Amino acid sequence: LLFGIFVAFNFMQQNKWEKSYRIAIGKYYKMSPDEAAKTTRFDGTCYFDEMVSPVNVGIRLSKGEKIYAVFENLSLMAYKRTGGFGFGGIFLRKKVAPAIYLRGGLGKFGLSKSLQADAVGTLYVTNKGIFYDGDKKNIKLAWDKIMRETINSDSIQLEKSNGSPVLLNGYIDPNEAAIMTLTGQLYESL
């Protein structure tokens, strides 16, 4: 019963975030909140350039680069060894004589890994790409190196053209997420 309530609550929170996210995107298409909340694909004229202004965060950028969205307190996630051992496979044991056994098989032995926070920092979205300013690690990716971004209420996943994806966990503001989505689409249309 408690598990069912927990699942229902999370589902309602996710739907609420999705609705806020669609309304935020619809604002740049000059749609009413009701119309934007029901829309799943936004087509038509986007007024992003006219409606959004760059954010000043006191960071020196390359010429012509402007910051449009800031996500604070995000954890950069990475697969790390947990210290536990993983062991599995197929093994056979055959008795040859009293107290003597013949053993053989195929197996795999290794240290187990799990997704853990590698750094905590701020993600900046610019017109030229994204950069993550973490306490232990920094990442800078140009828009042409990002194949796809997946944004949820609690994570952002950036799939790079080469290498493993970048996963950032934390609270994602739907308004900032809308700006990130539209900035990526703006780059695609150039």
Locations of the language-model features?
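Acidic, Ser/Thr- and proline-rich intrinsically disordered linker/docking segments
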Residues: N10, Q14-I23, K27-Y28, R81, ...
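Anionic N-terminal interaction surfaces
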Residues: G4-V7, W17-T122
